[in-house]
Amino acid sequence: MLCDNFPGAVFPGCYWGSYGYPLGYSVGCGYGSTYSPVGYGFGYGYNGCGAFGYRRYSPFALY
């Protein structure tokens, strides 16, 4: 998978946090899902490739 500035929807019907879901979680995707229901990883973006400071992801990859 890519390691760059995602437009929001990385997977079909899934979002990696901020853009698609303001709460900062991705539904059924894993990255920052139920472990961060209100943007637990706010200011972090770990997509399995590296930490990004401009995303609301969980600071760790769940899947």
UniProtKB/Swiss-Prot annotation:
What are the record's GO terms for cellular component? cytosol; intermediate filament
Q: Where is this region: 12 X 2 AA repeats of G-[YCGS]?
A: 12-54
Expressing tissues: Is essentially restricted to only one vertical half of the hair forming compartment and in beard hairs is absent from the central medulla.
Determine if Cytoplasm is one of this entry's keywords. Answer: no
- Which UniProt keywords are present, listed alphabetically? Keratin, Repeat
The record's listing under InterPro entries reads:
KRTAP8-1, KRTAP_type8/19/20/21/22
Supply the PANTHER family for this chain.
KERATIN-ASSOCIATED PROTEIN 8-1 (PTHR36131:SF1)
Q: Which family does it belong to?
A: Belongs to the KRTAP type 8 family.
> What function is annotated for this protein?
In the hair cortex, hair keratin intermediate filaments are embedded in an interfilamentous matrix, consisting of hair keratin-associated proteins (KRTAP), which are essential for the formation of a rigid and resistant hair shaft through their extensive disulfide bond cross-linking with abundant cysteine residues of hair keratins. The matrix proteins include the high-sulfur and high-glycine-tyrosine keratins.
**Complexes and interactors:** Interacts with hair keratins.
> What is the protein named?
Keratin-associated protein 8-1
Which gene is the coding source of this polypeptide chain?
Answer: KRTAP8-1
